[in-house]
Regions:
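Glycine- (often His-adjacent) and acidic-residue-rich active-site loop
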Residues: 56, 68, 108-117
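A glycine/threonine-rich phosphate-anchoring loop and its flanking beta-alpha core
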Residues: 11, 21, 111-194
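Conserved functional loop/turn residues at catalytic and ligand-binding sites
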Residues: 58, 87, 95-98, 136
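ATP/NTP phosphate-donor binding region
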Residues: 1-90
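Short Gly/Thr/Asp-enriched flexible loops that form oxyanion-binding sites at enzyme active sites
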Residues: 50, 80, 99-112, 145-146
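Short beta-strand/turn micro-motifs composed of small residues
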Residues: 37, 95, 152
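FAD-binding core of FAD-dependent oxidoreductases
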Residues: 92-104, 138-141
């Protein structure tokens, strides 16, 4: 049993009920973020508090929701196009692991160019992402604080990672108010994933 270790964490963690209200302060003045989420969260009304807070702070934003569980390359390329079209300069990943991973990979393509397939594996991302803030609404993935994102190959069903310290979010907002309404089954499975 080793009693010594090093631990480095570059993500600023904001925690507590209602902490979503601190989102504008984590973004640069005048930022224009792309919010990456999924249709289920839009339907559940969980995107509304985020857009309202940004709007109240006078920030313009764009929303991208073409995200599926076990995301594929088209989810990333579509998001990168949305980021460019809306002239965004920051990214917010809102949801479970899939939206947060897609947000990371959109940032990779937006700053490094090409296709996400070019960055599968470790150490292939050369340029840092735009400011990325992740807001998890489930309990299990940990994507909001890690240097990993996972892309699924639909032909083989194999999941390939993008691994780089450059994709670690600058901040994570852990607001229990956003996860309290999770369906019991989803809360249970993602909670067990965390354990």
């Amino acid at each position: 049993f080793q009693s010594h270790f090093d631990f480095r964490m570059s993500t600023h963690i904001v925690h507590g009920a209602g902490s979503i209200s601190r989102l504008p302060g984590l973004l640069a003045a005048g930022a224009r973020p792309l919010i990456v989420s999924d249709p289920g969260l839009v339907e559940a009304g969980l995107v509304d508090p985020v857009t309202a807070i940004l709007g109240d702070a006078g920030l313009k934003w764009a929303l991208y929701t073409d995200v599926v569980g076990n995301p594929v390359a088209r989810n990333v390329s579509g998001g990168a196009r949305a980021y460019e079209k809306a002239k965004c300069d920051a990214i917010i990943g809102l949801g479970g692991g899939s939206p947060m991973d897609v947000a990371k990979m959109i940032g990779v393509v937006a700053t490094n160019g090409g296709r996400i397939d070019n960055y599968l594996g470790s150490g292939k991302v050369k340029k840092s992402l735009p400011p990325l803030i992740c807001i998890p609404t489930t309990y299990g993935t940990g994507s909001e604080v890690t240097p990993f994102a996972v892309l699924t190959n639909p032909k083989t069903a194999i999941k390939d990672p993008v691994i780089s310290s450059k994709i670690t979010p600058i901040a994570a907002i852990l607001d229990p108010d956003l996860s309290i309404a999770l369906p019991m089954a989803l809360g249970g499975t993602t909670g067990m994933d965390a354990l």
